[in-house]
Amino acid sequence: MGRRFDYSFQNFDPERMARASGRDLRISPKLAVEVCRELRGMMLNDALRYLDDVIALRRPVPLKRYNDSQGHKPGKGFGPGRYPVKVAKAIKKVLLNAQNNAKQKGLDPDKLRIIHIAAHRGPVLRGWYPRAFGRPTPFNEQTTHIEVVVEEVRR
């Protein structure tokens, strides 16, 4: 059995909302925070198109917090940014899962808005490389938890 977890989103209404989560994803927590910030509030179809553009290296993700030594990207008034392809692929899977959960509930997939998306640090996968004179060099891998809540917008 898997570990029990709770969503950080409060006031979940099962009639109008659907949710999904990705646990222990082997992606950068810092870049996941930046991508989630960019997707929050978007319509789900627009968010999926945006992630496709990031994966194809057509649109960069602006870096607001973790942007030390990052170059500016092309575009009018665009500051520091990157193309986090691995993060975009992982978050796209979670968004598609949320879309399928909404379809299963009978919600219209074209009217879904991302009202909550968050990235949290997961457990660290500890590893090490053997080095000279019997010393180990640690090589740890960060994991990330992603959670998404979508809501059907009434127009």
UniProtKB/Swiss-Prot annotation:
Q: Which InterPro entries match?
A: Ribosomal_uL22 (IPR001063), Ribosomal_uL22_CS (IPR018260), Ribosomal_uL22_euk/arc (IPR005721), Ribosomal_uL22_sf (IPR036394)
| Biological process terms in GO annotation | cytoplasmic translation
Give the keywords, sorted.
Ribonucleoprotein, Ribosomal protein, RNA-binding, rRNA-binding
User: Gene3D superfamilies of this UniProt entry?
Assistant: Ribosomal protein L22/L17 (3.90.470.10)
The question of whether Amino-acid biosynthesis is a record keyword is answered with no
- UniProt-recorded Gene Ontology molecular function terms: rRNA binding; structural constituent of ribosome
**Matches recorded under CDD domains:** Ribosomal_L22
Q: Would you tell me the Gene Ontology cellular component terms?
A: cytosolic large ribosomal subunit
Origin superkingdom? Archaea
Q: What does this protein do?
A: This protein binds specifically to 23S rRNA. It makes multiple contacts with different domains of the 23S rRNA in the assembled 50S subunit and ribosome. The globular domain of the protein is located near the polypeptide exit tunnel on the outside of the subunit, while an extended beta-hairpin is found that lines the wall of the exit tunnel in the center of the 70S ribosome.
**Assembly and interactions?**
Part of the 50S ribosomal subunit.
Q: Which PANTHER family match?
A: 60S RIBOSOMAL PROTEIN L17
Family note: Belongs to the universal ribosomal protein uL22 family.
Q: What is this protein called?
A: Large ribosomal subunit protein uL22
Native organism: Pyrococcus abyssi (strain GE5 / Orsay)
Q: Which gene encodes it?
A: rpl22
